[in-house]
């Protein structure tokens, strides 16, 4: 403990920052959802979970599996002032999945991809830097 105190000097070893209000954009991918073949049942759940925190969902888009449109939708939310963008709609281990490429094409720095959350479901965390802010993009 003495070494930790010495290393920190007069500053605390760590601090807990207050949670700030966040604007969130939701990009729901998947051609099945866009075509209306399946109902998007996750966005209402996601909005409910986000409502437990001081957030505002500034919009939702459904670009299907069009990689360029996924990228454009993410960037549109960032340009509208989103503090976070969540991509939902079935990102998977499927090599044809367009969501990871759409996120990468924003220029965001992908910090993790491939951690299976459920069998067949994947997690991607990326950060887009704009005007000194790191905006998380989750997929």
Regions of interest found by a model, annotated:
Residues 1-58:
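Short, glycine/charged-enriched hinge/interface segments at domain edges or termini
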Residues 31, 37, 41, 54-139:
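Short glycine/threonine-rich loop/turn motifs
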């Amino acid at each position: 403990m003495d070494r930790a105190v010495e290393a920190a000097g007069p500053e605390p070893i760590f601090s807990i920052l207050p949670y700030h209000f966040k604007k969130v954009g939701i990009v729901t991918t998947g051609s099945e959802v866009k075509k209306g073949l399946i109902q998007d049942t996750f966005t209402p759940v996601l909005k409910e979970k986000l409502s437990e925190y001081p957030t505002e969902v500034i919009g939702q888009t459904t670009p299907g599996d069009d990689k360029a449109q996924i990228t454009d939708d993410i960037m549109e939310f960032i340009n509208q002032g989103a503090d976070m963008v969540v991509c939902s709609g079935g990102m998977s281990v499927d090599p044809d999945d367009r969501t990871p490429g759409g996120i990468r094409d924003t220029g965001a720095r992908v910090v993790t991809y491939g951690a299976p959350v459920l069998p067949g479901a994947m997690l991607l965390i990326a950060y887009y830097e704009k005007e000194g802010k790191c905006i998380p993009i989750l997929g």
